[in-house]
Structures are given as C-alpha cells and as structure tokens.
C-alpha cells in the first residue's frame, strides 16, 4: 500500500503538470482580448498619429518648421526648413535635405526665402551651368 500511495503521489504531480498547461491557456486567452482591446486603442491612436503625420509630412518634417510657417516666419523655399537667419548668413536649416524641393516650402504659407546653405548651393549650381 505504501508503494501504491507513493505511486499515487507520483501520479498526481504528472497529471497536475498535464493540467498546468490548460491553466495557462485561459490566462493567455484573457490577455489576447486585452491585446485586442489594446490594438483597438492603438487603432484609435494611429489615426491621430496619421493625422499628425499627414499634416506634418505633407508640409514639413519638423514641428518647428510647421510652427514657423503657421506664424508666417521665413522658411527656405528649397529645403523647406525654417530659416531664422536671412540669406548668406548661417541658420539652423539643414543644407543637405532637398527632398522637399520643388515647391515643398512655398505652398506651406508664410514668407518664402532661401537659407544660406541652399543659396550657396544654388549659386554653385548656377555657376556650373554657365
């Protein structure tokens, strides 16, 4: 009987191990709806982000540029970045980013001007053409 009882003690742990995986399944099932609800929340957040991205992406990449355009501050018509300093002076605008070129800055509103870097580059390009 002792061995039978020891067998009985050995058997319940193995079935308990077998029953343990089903127990995690309901908890994993409960987080799944939570993930769905989280996904629902993220879906609600994504359109907001898309709205911001669409508004920001269509006009410019940096919010400071958008703020500058909304306030009517001068911005570079070539690179699209806000240029706090006039032409031929060093400003904060990025020289190498010409992705917005082709009217990316002009339709945004505000006073259009070329930043120092784009001005110098355009002068160099014009000199190369001549």
Swiss-Prot record:
Annotated stretches, region: Disordered: 1-62
Pfam families, A to Z: DUF5558 (PF17713)
Pro residues: bias regions: 21-30
Cited InterPro entries: DUF5558 (IPR041059)
Protein name according to UniProt: Uncharacterized protein encoded by LINC02881
């Amino acid at each position: 009987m002792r061995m039978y009882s020891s067998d009985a003690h050995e058997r319940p742990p193995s079935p308990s191990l077998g029953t343990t995986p089903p127990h995690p399944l309901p908890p994993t099932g409960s987080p799944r709806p939570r993930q769905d609800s989280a996904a629902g929340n993220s879906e609600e957040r994504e359109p907001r982000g898309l709205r911001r991205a669409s508004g920001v992406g269509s006009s410019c990449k940096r919010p400071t540029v958008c703020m500058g355009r909304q306030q009517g501050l001068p911005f570079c018509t070539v690179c699209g970045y806000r240029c706090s300093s006039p032409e031929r002076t060093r400003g904060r605008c990025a020289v190498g980013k010409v992705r917005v070129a082709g009217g990316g800055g002009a339709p945004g509103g505000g006073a259009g001007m070329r930043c120092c870097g784009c001005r110098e580059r355009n002068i160099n390009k014009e000199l190369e053409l001549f």
